[in-house]
Amino acid sequence: MKPRIVYRPLHGILLLDKPAGLSSNNALQAARRLLRAEKGGHTGSLDPLATGLLPLCFGEATKIAGLLLGSAKAYDAEIVLGVTTDTDDADGQPLRERAVPDLSEADLQAALAPFIGRIQQQAPIYSALKQGGEPLYAKARRGERIEAPVREVDVQAIDVLGYSAPGLRLRVTCGSGTYIRSLARDLGEVLGCGAHIASLRRLWVEPFRAPQMITLEALSAALEAGTEARTLLLPIEAGLAGFARIVLDQTHAARFRMGQRLRDAAFPPGQVAVFGPDGTPSGLGLVDADGRLSPQRLFNGLNEIPAC
């Protein structure tokens, strides 16, 4: 019988390089078991086919997972023109094949232009979006007729990295909720030949623009070699780089951690990251126009060293 895994409090962010073929939740659970972390969450799903950056939040860092979910992201996509599939990627069943027209660089740029900016995008029917409390992919697998939702998304840039028919390589910088599978599908229709994603890699997620990612294999090897789990994680404050920073003295930091409101005309308005005098993050707060700081999310136990 395998020994029972004893989980412990562990706080921080792991920049996982997710492998292809694994769901985001399965990747999270694999990392959580290796780290023996009590609590964990990911910051937005990557398709099973996709690889690349999947920030995983553990312990108190799960309180900022939702903030990272809404961050800007960048992807490298390999697109195959001329074939559509039911999932809009290479994991799906082919639906239709069409001839790929002769395309110049100018043709590609003209076709891509309408997909840059604030656009309306219909999600793939094989997606984790919920309808009636159930993921769309579950309904699709049962053969139900589905009308996937259309949502406004923000695509900041699309760069052509290379084209050799039928393969097209793109780099896409976009906001939260953008489906690169949908972009490939819709681009294929504009070109008149259909398309699907052959491979997809997420390069970065704000604020981790130059991430030092780690694979599950490297994580396992490091832990087997005796590396302390907490040294493999980024501290919570690494995920707070985009917020205005307030540093409180010991007395006011204690009051903030007790949920009390504070007031100072010098506080910057809006959502802020609050730190104690030793640099330990106390939590997130919201400052109103009158300089009143209200606690939103409080971090606890960050100075505790997890048991081995």
Swiss-Prot record:
Keyword check for Isomerase: yes
Top-level taxonomic group: Bacteria
Catalytic activity: uridine(55) in tRNA = pseudouridine(55) in tRNA
Keyword Cell inner membrane included in the entry's annotation: no
CDD domains (alphabetical): PseudoU_synth_EcTruB (cd02573), PUA_TruB_bacterial (cd21152)
One Pfam family in the UniProt entry: TruB_N
Active site: 47
GO BP terms in the entry: mRNA pseudouridine synthesis; tRNA pseudouridine synthesis
Keywords assigned: Isomerase, tRNA processing
Protein name (database record): tRNA pseudouridine synthase B
Species of origin: Xanthomonas euvesicatoria pv. vesicatoria (strain 85-10)
